[in-house]
Amino acid sequence: MRNFQGKRIPVETIDKILNLALRAPSAGYTQGWAYVVVTDQKIRRKIGELQGESDFYAKRKHKFISEAPVLIVACISEQLYHDRYREPDKLKNDGQEIEWTIPFWYFDIGGACTIIFLATVNEGLAAAFTGIFRQQQMKELLGIPNHFLPIGIVSIGHPKKDVKSSSHRRGPRSSKDVIHYDRW
């Protein structure tokens, strides 16, 4: 969904959605995420500008960032994970922090954003996600602390008639191509 009505969304609804996201699983119960909820129209427009909305998204005729009544900027702190995994119950037998072969912080924020999507739909609303292209400028605009990284924007609003994007028209991959039991 990339086309929203401009109708206001009550703060209570956004709080309900985000409180569900706080229940997402996280490595070591670190919960290294934070969210900036943007409802101010001027700030939403600035975010749209940072994202290159007028160039890239204008081709689709929908400004789904600046025109969405609510933007949730999802942020993650790698530092909080390192801090948590230096605590006694998470150290390896040799007393050292684990080696992060997979950056769990990205997995965790992805799971939390999925819950935001599901909770949004459950409220009769629609959501769209986009990555952040100019992270440093976004941090400055929103006053995000240095140890947090803004990784994505969830645009939320009441759905408006939408035209399917070329990505959506591709359709999903076949379940037989992606689900494997016991062995690949």
Predicted regions and their residues:
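Small-aliphatic-rich amphipathic alpha-helix that forms the alpha element of a beta-alpha
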Residues: 21-22, 72, 92-141
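A glycine-rich helix N-cap at a beta->alpha junction
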Residues: 58, 62-71, 143-165
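Generic N-terminal amphipathic, Lys/Arg-enriched alpha-helix
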Residues: 1-7
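N-terminal structural module
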Residues: 21, 27-30
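C-terminal helix-cap and adjacent tail motif
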Residues: 1, 76, 90, 152-184
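Glycine/small-residue-rich phosphate/adenosyl-binding loop
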Residues: 30-109
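Short amphipathic alpha-helical segments
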Residues: 14-22
